[in-house]
């Protein structure tokens, strides 16, 4: 569910975007981008500037100045490269041309009607013909459609969700509001560092707070889901062993009560899974753990443990579990799916965990 939640959100956004605009709306947006792109190319060429004709649908590449007022542009081997989208305006195109050639010998507005049209491969068959892409082209209809879909789901709006890892996916309205603010939403991935000081401060503070809460030395905010966090953490453990010359340590102990992503991540990281029994109450069987750890003492890489467990229980033997694994040369990977239950009460780094994802 971790990777699905993180990536399905993007897929849903793309799907609703297509449903709202429909085939004709998307074609209109695409044609506008293409028209403005060709307008810019033609204007630059009329100013005597060399333009690369090989670039694709929305990108213009030309031999020009590497600075354009109020714009960040990519500059590579003497080429200025920029891309247009549905937010591009004719005024912006005028600014770009002005930055390269001050005295434009024509009216840029006239260029929109007289740009050089190039031949592009177009779809020959109808597309987006399904009802869902032709029924919700008004804001009210789209809003009702989204609400209809949401009402089919069970969420905290309806009642309690007993699984901790799902409860954590609640985002309060106060947290969702800033997402749409341009200061957050419109930041380009390749923006210069000196224009991201606010983001850098947020990231720095967040890392410090999370390290303090968990008791760990450092944190990476790169993984986009719990499953990706597991994979990254297990690779870090493997690299740790290898840095010490322990190239044979590839056994991962996993309790039979574990979430399915645990063994999946371990296999992806190249590890061999050794299951550990649980008692009737869902707690890890310490005797079986000790036997498995000793049997694999020279190959033991780590144990993956969820705390509190998937059963919602704080295992009183957590420190003993960590001790057994450490004594046999392994590391303790804590699945932090239920971290909300221990925040402010315990720090994973203090009771023996070596790596954790949140």
Where are these regions (language model features)?
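Conserved phosphate/anionic-ligand binding catalytic regions in large, soluble enzymes, centered on
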Residues: 4-10, 81, 154-176, 222-233, ...
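Conserved PLP-enzyme active-site core in the AAT-like
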Residues: 44, 66-68, 198, 228-358
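Gly-rich Lys/Arg/Thr-decorated short loops/hinges at beta-loop-alpha junctions or inter-strand turns
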Residues: 19-25, 52-55, 122-123, 181-194, ...
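Flexible inter-domain linker/hinge segments
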Residues: 90-162, 167-174, 179-183
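Conserved PLP-binding catalytic core of the aspartate aminotransferase-like
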Residues: 32, 46-69, 84-87
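Active-site C-terminal subdomain of aminotransferase-like
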Residues: 1-47, 52-54, 355-358
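Short Gly/Ser/Thr- and Asp/Glu-enriched loop/turn motifs at secondary-structure junctions
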Residues: 52-59, 74-80, 224, 266
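Conserved N-terminal alpha-helix of the aminotransferase class I/II PLP-enzyme fold
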Residues: 37, 138, 184-224, 229
């Amino acid at each position: 569910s971790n990777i699905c939640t993180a990536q399905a959100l993007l897929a849903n956004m793309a799907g609703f975007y297509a449903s709202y605009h429909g085939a004709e709306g998307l074609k209109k947006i695409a044609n506008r981008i293409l028209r403005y792109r060709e307008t810019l190319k033609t204007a630059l060429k009329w100013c005597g500037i060399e333009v690369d004709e090989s670039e694709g649908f929305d990108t213009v590449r030309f031999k020009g100045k590497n600075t354009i007022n109020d714009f960040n542009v990519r500059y590579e081997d003497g080429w200025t490269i920029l891309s247009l989208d549905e937010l591009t305006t004719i005024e912006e195109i005028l600014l770009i041309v002005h930055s390269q050639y001050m005295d434009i010998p024509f009216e840029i507005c006239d260029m929109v009607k007289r740009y050089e049209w190039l031949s592009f491969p177009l779809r020959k068959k109808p597309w987006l013909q399904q009802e869902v892409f032709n029924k919700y082209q008004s804001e009210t209809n789209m809003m009702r459609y989204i609400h209809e879909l949401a009402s089919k789901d069970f969420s905290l709006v309806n009642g309690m969700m007993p699984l901790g890892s799902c409860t954590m996916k609640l985002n309060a309205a106060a947290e969702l509001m800033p997402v749409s603010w341009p200061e957050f939403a419109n930041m380009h991935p390749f923006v210069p560092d000196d224009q991201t000081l606010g983001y850098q401060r947020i990231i720095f503070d967040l890392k410090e707070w999370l390290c303090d809460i968990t008791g760990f030395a450092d944190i990476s905010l790169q993984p986009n889901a719990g499953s990706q966090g597991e994979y990254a953490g297990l690779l870090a453990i493997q690299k740790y062993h290898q840095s010490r010359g322990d190239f044979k340590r590839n056994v991962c102990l996993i309790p039979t009560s574990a979430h399915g992503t645990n063994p999946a991540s371990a296999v992806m990281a190249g590890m061999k899974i050794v299951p550990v029994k649980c008692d009737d109450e869902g707690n890890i069987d310490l005797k079986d753990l000790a036997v498995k750890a000793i049997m694999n003492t020279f190959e033991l890489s780590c144990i993956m443990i969820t705390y509190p467990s998937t059963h919602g229980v704080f295992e009183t033997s957590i420190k003993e579990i960590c001790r057994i694994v450490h004594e046999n040369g392994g590391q303790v990977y804590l699945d932090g799916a239920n971290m909300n239950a221990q925040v402010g009460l315990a720090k994973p780094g203090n009771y023996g965990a070596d790596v954790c994802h949140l």
